[in-house]
Amino acid sequence: MVSFKAGINLGGWISQYQVFSKEHFDTFITEKDIETIAEAGFDHVRLPFDYPIIESDDNVGEYKEDGLSYIDRCLEWCKKYNLGLVLDMHHAPGYRFQDFKTSTLFEDPNQQKRFVDIWRFLAKRYINEREHIAFELLNEVVEPDSTRWNKLMLECVKAIREIDSTRWLYIGGNNYNSPDELKNLADIDDDYIVYNFHFYNPFFFTHQKAHWSESAMAYNRTVKYPGQYEGIEEFVKNNPKYSFMMELNNLKLNKELLRKDLKPAIEFREKKKCKLYCGEFGVIAIADLESRIKWHEDYISLLEEYDIGGAVWNYKKMDFEIYNEDRKPVSQELVNILARRKT
């Protein structure tokens, strides 16, 4: 049996790719990468995929074997090296987290049907691969509240269950899979559901100077962990639009802060008696390496303490790389921590 405790994300391969090309898809991740991951001690990968890989907007309902072949080969490699695979829809018809303000998925019945039909198709395709592959329905929902996501999620679960009653399904809450939003998910009486959250706290440490975050770029400070944010009062005084950051003044960045921010997920599990999974966590690669190692050490120790599986973001590139282009770890100590190897 495979385990889903110590995982790593394969972002940037068939999701969030820079260019839609056969050359990229054939070379970004190969069997050698999966072998490297397994040899490091990881027990699973999370494979984000974007729907255009397998379905064209011009031919709805016709699924592309050339795109599906990348999922197939990743699954075969994972089976060869005894790894689990979490298949995560990162970009759905009418929705992706980067463009949530222009999303149409939650108001367009045609897009919703496409979303459910894709999962229905994948459930049939991988009906005999229950041990190695789990399904994560949608990455990082961002909605005013959980109402529309709950409705679509329940419809999708029902469709999958008509085909496969024991497939592990991973379901995340609103607001970018926030631990605080798990409590607002619709209740499901199903023994094969795992509740998924993401964890990038404290944000201005894990995303320091992130080029895609207006607030991180504006603050533009090097932040160390453990430590504190510097210059908050002066920054807010000069940038009043970020007045919300005053609550970060004198905040101690340490393991107890991580525990506090993880608490909503733990309380949700205690109340619901369910399984939890952290589908993404990590620290931007431009952060101080020593701080990066210490944050992961503290966070992994909490996941271990609370018996929660998870997958670090990200195997390579995507600004959070754990490995470089030559499959060399940025830090062997960091890899050992992430693979939960006791040294």
From Swiss-Prot:
Catalytic function, reaction form: Endohydrolysis of (1->4)-beta-D-glucosidic linkages in cellulose, lichenin and cereal beta-D-glucans
Broad EC category: hydrolase
The enzyme's E.C. designation: 3.2.1.4
Signal sequence, renumbered to the chain: 1-21
UniProt record, GO biological process: cellulose catabolic process
Pathway: Glycan metabolism; cellulose degradation
InterPro entries found in the cross-reference section: Glyco_hydro_5, Glyco_hydro_5_CS, Glycoside_hydrolase_SF, Glycosyl_hydrolase_5
Transmembrane segments: none
Active site: 140 (proton donor), 280 (nucleophile)
Family matches, as Pfam families: Cellulase
Molecular functions (GO terms): beta-glucosidase activity; cellulase activity
PANTHER family, A to Z: ENDOGLUCANASE, PUTATIVE (AFU_ORTHOLOGUE AFUA_5G01830)-RELATED, GLUCAN ENDO-1,6-BETA-GLUCOSIDASE B
Function of the molecule: This enzyme catalyzes the endohydrolysis of 1,4-beta-glucosidic linkages in cellulose, lichenin and cereal beta-D-glucans.
Similarity comment: family membership: Belongs to the glycosyl hydrolase 5 (cellulase A) family.
Protein name: Endoglucanase C307
Organism: Clostridium sp. (strain F1)
Biological classification of the source: Bacteria, Bacillati, Bacillota, Clostridia, Eubacteriales
